C-alpha cells in the first residue's frame, strides 16, 4: 500500500461519517451459517486463519486503551495534566492551593481569576492592535493559554457538577414522593371521613326503621286489644 493510500485510509476512518470497514463483505448469510461449525473447530484447534474470523467479536482490551475511528481511547477516563500536553498551567494544583477551602471551591476561585485575566488580555490585545498590529501574536498566544486552562479547569469540575446534579435529582424525586404520600394520606383521610358519615347515616336509618316498626307493632297491638274488648 502506498503512502497516499495509507493517508487516505486514515482520513476515511477518522472522518465524521466513516465508510463501512472492508471486512463487512464477509458478513453474509452463508458465513453466518458456517460460523457455529467454525467455532467448534477453533475450540478443538483444528482450524487455521479464515475469513470467518472477522465475524467473531474481538476480545476485551487487555491494556488500558483501545483504538476506534482512528483515535486511541482510554478505558479509564483520565484527564491528563496540562504540563504533560506541553501547555503552561496557570493555576496551582489542588494540593498546592489553599488548604482551608474544598477542592471545588478552589476551582471556582481559579476560574474567576482566569476569567479576569482573559478580559485583561483581551483589552491589552485591542490596545496592541491599535498601536502596532504586528505584535499581536504574543497576546493571542496568552489568550489561547488562558482559554485552554479555563477549559481544563471546567473538565476537572465536571465530576463535582455530576454529583451535585445527581443530588438535586434525588432531592426532587424525594420531594415528589413525599408529596405523593401526603396526597395519598389526604385521600385516605377523606375516604375514612366519608365512611364514618355513611356509617352514621346507616345507624340513623336503622334506628328510625326500628322505631317505626315498634310504633307500628304497638298500634297493631292496641287495635287488637280494642277489637277483643268489643
Curated annotation (Swiss-Prot):
Main location per the UniProt record: nucleus
Keyword Transcription regulation: yes
Gene3D superfamilies: 6.10.140.1520, 6.10.140.200
Listed GO MF terms: transcription coactivator activity
Region Disordered, residue ranges: 1-22, 206-230
Pfam families on file: Med7
Keyword line: Activator, Nucleus, Transcription, Transcription regulation
InterPro entries given in the database record: Med7/Med21-like (IPR037212), Mediatior_Med7 (IPR009244), Mediatior_Med7_sf (IPR044888)
Localization per record: Nucleus
GO terms classed as biological process: negative regulation of transcription by RNA polymerase II; positive regulation of transcription elongation by RNA polymerase II; positive regulation of transcription initiation by RNA polymerase II; RNA polymerase II preinitiation complex assembly
Nucleus is among the record's keywords: yes
Domain of life the protein comes from: Eukaryota
Function noted in UniProt: Component of the Mediator complex, a coactivator involved in the regulated transcription of nearly all RNA polymerase II-dependent genes. Mediator functions as a bridge to convey information from gene-specific regulatory proteins to the basal RNA polymerase II transcription machinery. Mediator is recruited to promoters by direct interactions with regulatory proteins and serves as a scaffold for the assembly of a functional preinitiation complex with RNA polymerase II and the general transcription factors.
Family under the similarity heading: Belongs to the Mediator complex subunit 7 family.
Summary of subunit composition and partner proteins: Component of the Mediator complex.
Protein's name in the database: Mediator of RNA polymerase II transcription subunit 7
Source organism: Candida glabrata (strain ATCC 2001 / BCRC 20586 / JCM 3761 / NBRC 0622 / NRRL Y-65 / CBS 138)
